Amino acid sequence: MAKITRTNPEGISKPFSNYSHVVTAEGAQKLVFCAGQVGADVDGKVLPPDDFDAQAKMVMANLTKALAAGGAKIADVTKITIFICNPHDVPKARGILPTYFAGAAPASTLCILRGLANPNFLLEIEAIAAV
């Protein structure tokens, strides 16, 4: 099991949301890289394109399953990247971290893009975990 340390160094602004500026993993025997997960169910059906919260819940369920397939769990995540298309969804996107990563805030990047692979996707999240 990796020893994961999360730090917010002095001299850098406080995080704007529930994330850590620096995450180190010592003694990691395995890194798990999860491709971007989206708001689609097991059959590939995209959840309603106007329901960010429903898609976010599905994204996190999919991410949890992907991590488990690699032998990791949410608490092992050291870095996530969140991709969204609508700047108005920034507060909701930032809300994902305290909801799902409480007490284990990973290093995080939030990107606003012109679009994702399917125009009905409202967000996509990729992750790296250390176990």
Where are these predicted regions, by residue range?
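N-terminal presequence-like segments and the immediate start of the first folded domain
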Residues: 1-61, 65-78, 84-131
